[in-house]
């Protein structure tokens, strides 16, 4: 993402731009533009080209936005080779349950994952087949 400190234009609410799929978020110290994902290895160097694109799109969204202090950031998300999360019992340690690897869809998958984990903790059969998410697939 890219963050502009103390911009002249500041939205009061989060704004999602649907055509280019990015978000403008008002922060205490400025405005943050985010919304891209890049698949790369853990040792890959950051590619801030996407941040530059986000800044251009943000300036198009807010025409009065000027070049105030800019910071760029990127971080790793827990993504797995098959793009599915790991949800289920740890095969090696009793009473340990896994629920990770949702990548950039973590917030979307959280309610269903929470229900599955609650069912497993209570020794109930989950409402959906969790075979595609089993830890042993790797």
Language model features: what each stretch is:
Residues 1-94:
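Active-site substrate-recognition segment that forms the wall
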Residues 6, 86, 90-138:
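C-terminal lid/capping helical subdomain adjacent to the catalytic/cofactor pocket in oxidative enzymes
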